[in-house]
Amino acid sequence: MDKKVILISIDGLRPDAVETCGHPFVNTLRENGCYSPDASSVVPPVTLPAHTSIFYSVPPIRHGIITNDYMPPVRPIRGLAEQLERADKTCAAFYGWEPMRHVWTSGNMKYSLFVNEYEEDNSDLLLTQEALSLIERKEPDFVYLYLVET
């Protein structure tokens, strides 16, 4: 079986909070997944610029996203989802904040689900359940789960 990756991003959750929250599930994720207690954000430490940097491996000054307002890049670059697609990997995204869809090219995510956190109670729970269901049914190579109700 090929290795699979699930990237879970919980908006506003600092590394020190992961270590001290004491929740059994968070502890299990930390102990069995990849976690960096020394992680730091980009400047500015704002959601859209930070996640764009995660997906494109460059700072905001290079990708051009410096606020939570999306602007098409002047100098497009190939990002994580594009590289995975070129390697014939199947990608999926589950997210609760609409601007997040800009951190990948829409065609690169074979499966994508947006649940509006402002219109749906428990959007994080719904997204998580849908992600788990898809993982069981389709076994995607890469799953991005963005949780916003923090």
Question: Where do the model's predicted regions map?
Answer:
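DG-centered beta-turn motif at the end of beta-strands
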Residues: I10-L13, V148
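Active-site-proximal alpha/beta segments of enzymes that process anionic O-linked groups
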Residues: D2-K4, G12-K138
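A structural motif
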Residues: K138-T150
